[in-house]
Amino acid sequence: AYFYYLVKAMVEAGKKMGFEESLATLLVKQTMLGSFHLINNADKSLDDLIKAVASKGGTTEAALREFEAGDLSKTLQTGILAAERRAKELSKG
């Protein structure tokens, strides 16, 4: 569900940009597929892949600045760790 949640947020942003939902969804899916391909096939770290597509002063860099300002990485990690805690609780019965 985590990835679906991210895709949904990206599609919603596309709709706010004026794209029809179907086109926004297609663009996000293509972006995800391209990203998966690079993660799966490139001999680079995730940090290197991020640097490779985040041009200085570019659009991706602007988005990443907003993600960092909102501490998106920490928020995602907190959610995943909450799921782990809940899984442990459920396994205890």
List each language-model region with its residue ranges.
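Active-site-proximal catalytic alpha-helix in oxidoreductases
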Residues: 1-15, 26-39
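Membrane-interface starts of transmembrane alpha-helices
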Residues: 20-24
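NAD(P)-dependent Rossmann-like dehydrogenase/reductase catalytic/cofactor-binding core
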Residues: 25-93
